[in-house]
């Protein structure tokens, strides 16, 4: 993408000046590796990941090397971060609105005003795809009709959590079906064998830094056999640490320098 060309040009200049190699990674690889920085147990095995931000809301399948990232689902229209920012701005909050919107939502959850309101935003999920445009429309109309900002803010996070929970369950179901089918094609079919299915989910991107969203999602999936992995909020929203870690690992792989990841300052 053009927005990343400035950084690439700077890297090439530094490389030429210092005589060091340049390693190229995607923006998405950086976010995934940054989130995995606090979840080293995921490295070396396949897992799912949600990349949630203002520019991306994708469900990904990641291979053990982090080099093969396949998009298997996600939004069909606006992103989760766009939903948060647009409604936050509609409430008079500054862009980006995530942190302020979460504060308003937290207060509504604490004083029970959201629970008492009965207001709920719809969650639209089909297989591994979701939609947030209808949610934005209903929430915007509710604000125009005088619904309390805290109620709408809490409803937004509740909607995103319900949407992600449905996608997690659908992904597990599909993965289990695929694992069973593969087992049948290799050896005697063993109905119900789920040992080969992937059930670990890593959450990356700015939206994933929300404490409320994490708590809501964990609550909705606490009875589901799944591992949810979150990183420190600062690692959710910044992929620079991920790029640094990937470069250090590439250096070690090429036998140049064995760098300790502890040298990466967060």
PLM regions with names:
Residues 1-12, 16:
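Short beta-strand-loop/turn "lid" adjacent to the catalytic site in phosphate-handling enzymes
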Residues 264-266:
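Conserved small/polar residues in nucleotide/adenosyl-binding loops
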Residues 3, 47-51, 202:
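Short glycine-aspartate micro-motif
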Residues 20, 25-48, 246:
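Conserved phosphate-binding catalytic cores of ATP/NTP-utilizing and phosphoryl-transfer enzymes
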Residues 43-45, 50-53, 57-147, 249, ...:
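A short helix-loop
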Residues 23-25, 201, 218-243:
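Conserved phosphate-binding/catalytic loops in two-lobed NTP-binding clefts
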Residues 103-178, 182, 187-192, 197-201, ...:
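A contiguous, well-structured pocket-lining segment that forms one wall/lid of small-molecule binding clefts
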Residues 55, 205-207, 233:
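Active-site metal-binding loops of divalent metal-dependent hydrolases
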